[in-house]
Amino acid sequence: MAKSTSSAPSQRMLRVGEQVRAAITQVLQRGDVRDPLIESTVISISEVRMSPDLKLATAYVTPLGVADHAAVIEALNKHAKFIRGRLGPHLRQMKYMPDVRFRDDTSFENYQKIDSLLRSPEVSRDLDRDSDEE
């Protein structure tokens, strides 16, 4: 049986990614990470993408209420090995504990740009014109 060459994540990658996301969320909520910047910031983890071999987890995070996202991401990456160690009790079924990387989630900004474009007068005029022709 040949392996699939599609770039879409497998069901297992999605399931494990969701489990890792929940585990990281619990570690951060409990306050296990002793860093003033992380402790004082509300951090939303929107998605965790797993590598095909499940050895690397990329967590997309959005620090809420902080202007300097890069500093929070840097602090999280500085404590990534500690966080990885705290994932063990939550992910007992994993053969290997994945390395964790944190990245800034820009999807919300992209959604806002698309929304503002759709609400612009030029686009709404074109949309109104299309609906009048039907």
Swiss-Prot record:
Keywords from the UniProt entry: Cytoplasm, Ribosome biogenesis
Domain of life (superkingdom): Bacteria
Cell compartment(s), UniProt: Cytoplasm
Database matches in PROSITE patterns: RBFA
Main location class: cytoplasm
Record-level GO cellular component terms: cytosol
Any single Pfam family the record assigns to this protein: RBFA
A GO molecular-function annotation: ribosomal small subunit binding
Entry's Gene Ontology BP terms: maturation of SSU-rRNA
S-S bridge residues: none
Subunit structure, interactors included: Monomer. Binds 30S ribosomal subunits, but not 50S ribosomal subunits or 70S ribosomes.
HAMAP family, per the entry: RbfA
Function of the protein: One of several proteins that assist in the late maturation steps of the functional core of the 30S ribosomal subunit. Associates with free 30S ribosomal subunits (but not with 30S subunits that are part of 70S ribosomes or polysomes). Required for efficient processing of 16S rRNA. May interact with the 5'-terminal helix region of 16S rRNA.
Similarity field: Belongs to the RbfA family.
NCBIfam families xrefs: PRK00521.2-5, rbfA
Protein name: Ribosome-binding factor A
Biological source species: Sinorhizobium medicae (strain WSM419) (Ensifer medicae)
